[in-house]
Amino acid sequence: MNDSEFHRLADQLWLTIEERLDDWDGDSDIDCEINGGVLTITFENGSKIIINRQEPLHQVWLATRQGGYHFDLKGDEWICDRSGETFWDLLEQAATQQAGETVSFR
């Protein structure tokens, strides 16, 4: 994968997250902001999830209250380089815990 392909795929990921949160109809307030390649999700309780891209490594990094995760693209899925879990699974687990209600991005 070259840098432009990596940015296209990361942009696609950011857009999906932003669209899902724009359509969010849950009870808690969840905000999303993109600034300089960093996507920040802020929850009503003040907690945050930070997602950023690591261009030199062609990785997407996810920082939550539970910990930090690094994802490599394998086929058509972003996969954690330690646990083997998908990006969407870990993001939904963290968002659900931090929002206090079920959050789905798929």
Swiss-Prot record:
Gene3D superfamilies: Frataxin/CyaY. Keywords: Iron, Metal-binding. Pfam families: Frataxin_Cyay. It comes from the Bacteria. NCBIfam families: FeS_CyaY. Belongs to the frataxin family. This is Iron-sulfur cluster assembly protein CyaY. It comes from Escherichia coli O7:K1 (strain IAI39 / ExPEC).
